[in-house]
Structure formats: structure tokens, C-alpha cells
Amino acid sequence: MKTPLRYPGGKSRAVKHILPFIPEGVERVCSPFFGGGSVELALASRGVQVFGYDKMKQLVWFWQGVCGDNNRLADEVEKLQEQYVIRSKKTVKGCSKKSFHQYRKDLMTESFMFSYERAAKYYAINRASFSGATFSGGWSERASYAR
């Protein structure tokens, strides 16, 4: 499985070079800086039990959604897209610049508790920002509508 996130410093292109250095027979991996999780997902697909942690709460919420009920998370992402289509009366799916800034504001000011809606908002801004730089990067029209 490939990571669904774009993540600064991500290892998606390096996975094939990193995995040979993981000894055979490893049963568990603890990742204190999970981020986009490329290496960890590759290990999990081999049956390795992965414990992932990260300081960024919003990123953790996203992964909680994926590991909890990924169908519900997908439904929440779809709901965000449908709300945009209804509000803007446009048929294109993506994350508008206005929505991008609103979602970022929501994630920085709302309660710091997990919800599938917050996890979906994190995913939306990750996919719509330059190189996945969610809170430090800006909105990218190309990134937003290309995914």
C-alpha cells in the first residue's frame, strides 16, 4: 500500500532502498516520527506490526481515521467535496482556495479531539498544498484539482 499523503521529507521514493536494511524476522517497528508513513506501510504490508506516533495532532487524526474506519473517512472527504460543489455551483471536484484556508483555520482553532471530519479536512489540505506542506505551505490550484 502506498501512502495517500504527500509529505515533506517523505520516503515514498526511497522505500525500495530502505527496506533491504530492515532485518528479516522483524515483527514490530516503533516509529516516533510517522509522517507520511511510506516505509511503515510497506512494512505493515509484509505483516510487521507498526506502532506509529507523531507530534502533529492533525496528522495523527488522519491516520486514526485510516486505521479506524477508512470508509467513514472516505465518506467525510466526499462530503467536503460535495459541500464545495453545492456552495460554489461548480462541478469540478477539488479543494478551493477559500475552503483550503477555512479548513486550515478550523484545524488550528477547533477542539483538539479526533473526529472523522477533522481527519478529512487534514487530508484535503494535504492534497491541496504545495508538496503536502499543510500548515506551512500555500494552496496549489494544480495540486488541488489534480488529485
What are these regions (language model features)?
Residues 1-34, 38-39, 43-45:
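S-adenosyl-L-methionine
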Residues 46-147:
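Class I S-adenosyl-L-methionine-dependent methyltransferase module
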